[in-house]
């Protein structure tokens, strides 16, 4: 069933790409809602796949879906911010707000995830992430590069109302690099403890 979600989202993305190439704003408007639903469905399916690993307690948290949805928003805003360097993307303020909102939501959900108390295996995995072998990757890559830097750059871009896309593109690149660092640490942490 998840394959259908992925195929539908890929089809919507392909149609969006064609609409962009042909400068068909009407089709892009029609595809906006299916694109958002497809992105949310893809993030949801990813959470479902993690939940199938029942021996990995860290991946069973009820916050996993909200974290992945917030990360999907972050990745979408980051992608548009970077594309604005080579394409003329309208509404760059909206893109900055989407990126900032995604980063803020991701930070809030990650904090809730770390502050919550689960099983002993969850506690060990969180300890590995925040104070163990993955701590530098998590704090420097995931939090500083992936959350603090993009938020600061997006706020600066909104405050200065600059016409140059470089500032927001830098925020987007930092956000995606941080998402990678966080997710890598999250997956490693889940695997660092014995199966429950």
Residue ranges of model-derived segments:
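Short, highly charged, low-complexity non-transmembrane loops/tails of multi-pass membrane proteins
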Residues: 190-196
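Surface-exposed loop/turn and secondary-structure junction residues enriched for glycine/proline
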Residues: 53, 189-190
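Long, contiguous internal "core" modules enriched in hydrophobic/ aromatic residues
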Residues: 4-8, 12-181
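Iron-sulfur-cluster electron-transfer modules
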Residues: 1
């Amino acid at each position: 069933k998840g394959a259908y979600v992925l195929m539908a989202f890929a089809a919507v993305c392909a149609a969006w790409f064609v609409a962009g190439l042909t400068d068909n704003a009407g089709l892009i408007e029609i595809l906006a809602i299916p694109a958002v639903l497809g992105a949310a469905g893809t993030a949801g399916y990813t959470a479902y796949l993690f939940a199938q690993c029942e021996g990995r307690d860290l991946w069973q948290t009820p916050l996993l879906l909200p974290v992945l949805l917030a990360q999907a928003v972050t990745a979408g805003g980051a992608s548009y911010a970077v594309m604005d360097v080579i394409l003329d993307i309208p509404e760059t303020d909206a893109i900055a707000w989407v990126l900032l909102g995604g980063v803020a939501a991701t930070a809030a959900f990650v904090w809730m995830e770390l502050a919550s108390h689960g099983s002993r295996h969850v506690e060990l995995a969180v300890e590995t992430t925040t104070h163990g072998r993955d701590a530098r990757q998590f704090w420097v890559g995931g939090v500083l590069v992936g959350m603090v830097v993009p938020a600061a750059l997006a706020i600066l871009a909104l405050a200065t109302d600059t016409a140059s896309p470089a500032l927001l593109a830098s925020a987007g690149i930092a956000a995606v690099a941080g998402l990678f660092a966080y997710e890598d640490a999250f997956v490693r942490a889940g695997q660092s403890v014995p199966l429950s």
